[in-house]
Amino acid sequence: MPGHARSVADVGAGDGQLARHLAARGLRVVATERRPPSFARLRVALPQLDCRLGEGLEVLRPGEVEGVVLAGMGGHSIARIVAASPAVAGALDWLVLQPQQHADRLVAWLEAAGWRIDARDIAVQGRRSYTVLLVTGHERS
């Protein structure tokens, strides 16, 4: 995540651990979940944060946050979420993406859509490793 970041949406926030960590670092955080049971647990876990129920980026307004984190889902799902909300996605300065699979296909899609891969790293969790991408520079039309 860019060091200068001030606001972020954690899309598909799950149990809220990442959102809580980001808020503790001083960022303004919007945490989202698409399923009502998961959203209810998120609201209980993070009563002090802005938690929203809805699909992907659809619960955000263009320019409301500087960037988004999409982690713990497949590359195809990440691409679908970004593509489904072009006004919101086009207003983002950056994305941090951690696809569970199909990272290379996601990178190809992002580049074709006008995004630039600024950093690529590997995160290790137990026996598994995952690609982590910092994506910026969407060509706004």
Predicted regions and their residues:
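S-adenosyl-L-methionine
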Residues: 36, 40-62
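Short SAM/SAH-binding signature in class I
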Residues: 65-72
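Conserved SAM-binding motif I beta-strand of class I
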Residues: 28-33
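Conserved SAM-binding loop of SAM-dependent methyltransferases across substrates and taxa
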Residues: 15-27
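Short glycine-rich anion-binding loops that position phosphate/pyrophosphate groups of nucleotides
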Residues: 14, 73-76
